[in-house]
């Protein structure tokens, strides 16, 4: 029997006794085939495991975004999607150096379909950060006060409104006339659905007294009653029925024939705006009142709140009415009411700092723990997985849950403190499974009253189940790790898989499965081997062609993809090397600084001396800290690793990085340092302002620094800047330079 238990896996998923069941991998997401790794809690992830998890989350979220925003056919529940996003964000927060260039944190929606013409949004349609607890909301208020430099007792009002589960739409009015309607798309480019939007009764065609340009944004949705009636009508006529009101609304709005949309009972709530030529009001509340005057429908549950406790009270009031509203909502959105403060707070890459979505909780379920399996990850971590009797949690059938590590099974956390009141987990137990706050299904509780007689404590292995090597647990480490290294089949192939992954060289036709097969056959052992396949096996690579599913065309396509990858961007090659602490974001930073691999390697060689200018230059790159720099230097100067890199460079010619374009502000392209106490803005606001103007903000003064902004108490940084001949200005001069005064 395999470690997957008495199940077999087919193209449609997990099968047993002739019945198809939904299989979820350790991420809790439908994958079709079992994954080889199990995942630990974010706080227990190693660097390598975190890198691998971020790659997998990126792929899963990209697929989910396309299904939801473009195809109107999501396979994940909202709770599962939110949990994926939250886990991704939590890993990035713990390992900022690993943030990928295609990070889901920087993505909004999905690329628009080719079915409709494209519309570039004048102001991006961003998503919202999520909150899942009362404490998250209090922290949200605290962050805003800290950013704005406001006292804890300073008045600060918010609006609270239901989060409608529909399709986001932007309506552009020019001289009061509706001229364009566009979906969110990927946030920057959406789909032109103007003709269809004109058929929705809640959307005015003309606005009296509106500014010359006004983009009104809101949500298209369908009521429960209208959804039921539509599905009944569709079933009678043999048409497509919809899984839920959100899918029905999205599918109805995105019809090629506007008359079909006209026949669908769509509704629209207005709640935001994009481009606007003149302000409508000074607050969010007053702006919504103006929308109502224009003829838009505003959700009647929208209220103004004076404190976080008021916000939480409204959250509970809305949640209590959720079942009787007659339309789907999945949380409550809070927005800072003062529009001038919204402007000061600004935006992160994909979300505003002044708003947050407080999501409703996911479901819990009880089921029986049938087995505990041990899986070996990329770094050798031995991770336990709970095999469960299938149970529905949050709308998805769950059959696996993470058990994190041996401490978690024994009922204690990584510090030795008891969890679950110190109750251990045993095979045969009835356990409570949940998915809130993390994509991986977890076990919240154990029902000791139902524990089978004779259930034994779980004996965690001290040797690797894959290769038999010792699996010691180092002091301070939360997990046991296989000591077999590359002789362990569960670890050896992972570096190659990372090298060809989507964020790295992304070689079409050479995915994880193919890498595993080629490795087992002895065809590839390191990245350079990929680029010598044709030379070593000849034009035909007959061994490949003889395999099922391969032929002349597919083999040639693989060779062509490999040849294309020879000139992959320098940043992708660097990321593909899988250097600890060097994620996609860090790879891009390094590539933009050094431009070529040759220049990087020369700098690394010189930076071995940590008193050298090369070391200081490396640390001066904004976003590169000592841990990251030391890992880069140590890895690339290690003899075996450098030899492997040199063999790779003999086969490829990475495309040099292109220095990023900067704007025309006075500080664009310059490196700034802030020091001392700023009196008119917080340090975070100053940094955000400088970066928005195209400047780089460093944490320390060096020869590369162009300008030091010094407030009271500047200290040693100001002294060093003066010694280096760097221009030093005060906060007032900075505000003038930044156009704030």
UniProtKB/Swiss-Prot annotation:
GO MF terms held by the record: DNA ligase (NAD+) activity; metal ion binding
Top-level taxon of origin: Bacteria
Gene Ontology biological-process annotations: DNA repair; DNA replication
Occurrences of domain BRCT (ranges): 662-741
SMART domains assigned to the protein according to its UniProt record, in alphabetical order: BRCT (SM00292), LIGANc (SM00532)
EC number of the protein: 6.5.1.2
Active site: 163 (n6-amp-lysine intermediate)
Tagged with keyword Zinc: yes
Function statement: DNA ligase that catalyzes the formation of phosphodiester linkages between 5'-phosphoryl and 3'-hydroxyl groups in double-stranded DNA using NAD as a coenzyme and as the energy source for the reaction. It is essential for DNA replication and repair of damaged DNA.
Protein name: DNA ligase
Gene encoding the protein: ligA
